[in-house]
Regions:
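Acidic donor-binding segment of Leloir-type glycosyltransferases
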Residues: 20-55
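Active-site-adjacent helix/loop segment of glycosyltransferases
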Residues: 191-253
């Protein structure tokens, strides 16, 4: 089996010297999509290519663009702020290949200090989203009050099937992407990973958390810094788009 990696750089040139040397030896090819001026890496590994956009595109558009430029049986999307441990990709690919209906696999993601990040999730509910994205989270801390959403009662050291996985580092089966139409380019920012997991689920594909694979993620969590910002507005609009596209999710609460 072959693995192609797609990295989207939107002004992330400074982070690529950490990611690319760690990622490139683990995959067959890497495509870096530079989405705006100043996004190009200073140097490319031998198995990497650069695509430079004439105008900025949305994240999902860039992922689809990079995917079309690759040929691997599996497509790995990696955020510029991630750094995989040695053999992280092999661990993901080995597990995913052992399950014929595994369409998406995600690693154990950790903060730079080694603390586990809760990247495996259940699909959001209306009530849960309101708590997480409003001042209510100060009264009802999500990681304490929404254990089911974050699968906190599951062992972090054991594989578990999740509804969706945070889109920082995802291994995706190409046949699944082709079947469901890739990433939904209608999202401006945020929720693309939730939508991807939901459409994969509807098509009968599994989504797995694989802790044998470890990735460091220096996540800024921009959308959580302030209650009123352009990022929270983008997130709200994306959630509204998700509900419009999948109105049956409203029945979840």
């Amino acid at each position: 089996m072959s693995v192609s990696a797609v990295v989207v750089s939107h002004g992330h040139a400074a982070e690529l010297p950490l990611l690319l040397p760690a990622l490139a030896p683990q995959v067959d090819e890497v495509v870096v999509v530079a989405n705006r001026p100043g996004s190009e890496p200073a140097a490319l590994p031998a198995n990497a290519r650069l695509l430079v956009n004439e105008r900025p595109l949305r994240l999902a558009e860039n992922v689809n663009l990079g995917t079309r430029a690759t040929s691997g049986d599996w497509v790995l999307f990696a955020n510029p702020d991630t750094v995989p441990e040695p053999d992280a990709v092999a661990a993901l690919a080995s597990f995913a290949a052992s399950r014929p209906r595994c369409g998406i696999a995600g690693p154990r993601v950790e903060w730079p200090d080694g603390t586990w990040q809760p990247t495996r999730r259940r699909f959001p509910t209306v009530s849960g989203t309101l708590v997480r994205r409003t001042p209510l989270r100060l009264v009802f801390p999500p990681l304490e009050r929404q254990r089911a959403h974050y699968l906190l009662d599951e062992d972090v050291d054991e594989p578990v099937e999740a509804d969706w996985l945070l889109g920082a580092f995802l291994l995706m089966r190409r046949t699944m992407l082709e079947e469901i139409g890739g990433w939904d380019a209608g999202y401006r920012h945020y929720v693309e990973d939730i939508d991807l997991g939901y459409r994969a689920m509807r098509a009968g594909w599994e989504r797995w958390y694989v802790p044998a694979s470890r990735v460091r993620h220096d996540w800024a969590q921009v959308s959580d810094r302030r209650f009123l910002s352009r990022h929270t507005l983008w997130h709200a609009r994306s959630m509204a788009r998700f509900v419009r596209g999948h109105p049956e999710t409203l029945r979840r609460g």
